[in-house]
Amino acid sequence: VNPANRNLLQGSGTSRAIYQAAGEQELTAACEAIGRCDLGRAVCTPAFGLPAKYIFHAVCPAWHGGGFGEAEQLAGAYHSALELAAEYHCESVAFPLLSSGNYGYPKEQAFRIAVDTITQYVMEHDLTVYLVLYDRDSLAVSRKLFASVEEYIDDHYVAQNDESYGFGRRCRELSERRRLLEEDAALPMLGAVPAPAAAPRTA
């Protein structure tokens, strides 16, 4: 998932890295063909040179103090990209921590929104989701909050849904998957199964 602006122009940081890896000319042309995307929404392009099928461009809010609908817009960007992943029959999708870089969203709040939105979605959809953390501050926040995330899932989902949907198994996998934070700062969140060593091309 590319953290995008409304004009779908190449940004800095993660966005620049995605454009360079995919092929700037091809990806720029694909985004220009789409034109614009509303804040809190996402659009899809081919992945071109990236080892994935698609790139979902999620238009993220900048932080203006929290009183301008930023939380709803950020949750919407995650949800829209997740809906695209389902629409395009993806088995997995990887997100950076949206809006937490140059857009200035406080990392702890950004992480909570990411986890809450992704958790609610994957409880009803068979999709493996990775939240990729690039810096020490984001990793520190994730370590601080992850135990409370597991407790929240247990309290709100497992008891009533375990028999029908196997959510208990999904949640038990969280303990093992948290270990990946210590290894490579990539957090696979609540997917139906752990990603295999030779995983299929992902979005």
Question: What residue spans do the PLM features occupy?
Answer:
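Phosphate/ribose-phosphate-bearing ligand recognition and processing surfaces
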Residues: A62-A199
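Glycine-/small-residue-enriched capping loops at alpha/beta junctions
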Residues: N2-E87
